[in-house]
Regions:
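Short, glycine/polar-rich helix-capping loops at beta-to-alpha or helix-loop-helix junctions
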Residues: 150-163
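Generic N-terminal amphipathic, Lys/Arg-enriched alpha-helix
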Residues: 5-36, 172
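Glycine-rich, small/polar surface segments that engage phosphate groups of diverse ligands
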Residues: 47-115, 120
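A short, well-structured juxtamembrane/interface segment
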Residues: 34-54
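A charged, well-structured terminal subsegment
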Residues: 121, 175-197
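Short beta->alpha connector loops at strand-helix junctions that form conserved
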Residues: 89, 125, 151, 167-175
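Surface-exposed amphipathic alpha-helices with a cationic face
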Residues: 78, 137-141
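Short glycine/serine/threonine-rich phosphate/pyrophosphate-binding segments
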Residues: 66-71, 129-136
Length: 197
């Protein structure tokens, strides 16, 4: 199991019983997918529609698995929903800005260089505590961007306090949190496509 997996229901029975493990795992995932309301996802949908209609773009950032989500969602937003979206996953960009400004500052500096007035920053972090993500979110606010955060773990994590719209997963399992974040974002894209927006 991934280090740090802290879901209590996994401890109530031996993990050698794979049927129990997977049933419990998917039950928990199903519950966590409902940590957000339809109104919140509808609000995010409208954020995307508004930025597109105003000629802006969505910038999606994260570390590790969250960066992978950023790549997937940026492509689908652009291609399927016609909302221009980018991410900052290029190794040359990360190493350049990390080397010149410090790893903790690279996201904030990249936002400074690549964002335009009226853009939206979607900032993803399972823990909501990664220093570069928190600094990046604060930089986005300072730049006047609309900030959407997706986080998990503690309800009072640092990232969740920064965004204009904050979506939170009540779990301390990285994979549960990341799968939920990606599912929420892709559901919003599918909703935009279905609604013809």
């Amino acid at each position: 199991l991934q280090k740090g997996l802290q879901l209590s229901f996994f401890r109530s029975r031996k993990l050698s019983d794979q049927e129990y493990f997977f049933n419990s795992y998917f039950d928990e995932l199903s519950v966590r997918l409902r940590d957000v309301s339809a109104d919140q996802l509808g609000e995010l949908s409208q954020v995307f529609v508004n930025v597109r209609d105003k000629g802006g773009k969505v910038i999606i950032i994260g570390n590790g698995g969250s960066a992978a989500i950023a790549s997937h969602v940026a492509v689908d937003l652009t291609k399927a929903a016609r909302v221009r979206a980018i991410n900052f996953n290029e190794a040359d960009l990360i190493t350049c800005f990390g080397n010149d400004y410090g790893y903790e500052n690279w996201m904030g500096k990249a936002l400074e260089f690549y964002s335009d007035a009226g853009d939206v920053a979607v900032i993803i972090s399972s823990s909501g505590e990664s220093q570069n993500v928190v600094i990046g979110a604060k930089a986005a606010r300072d730049l006047g961007l609309q900030v959407v955060t997706l986080s998990g773990f503690r309800a009072d994590n640092s990232l969740r306090a920064i965004g204009h719209l904050n979506l939170w997963v009540n779990s301390e399992s990285y994979n549960i949190v990341e799968t939920t974040h990606q599912s929420w974002l892709l559901a919003v894209i599918d909703r935009l496509v279905e609604a013809g927006q």
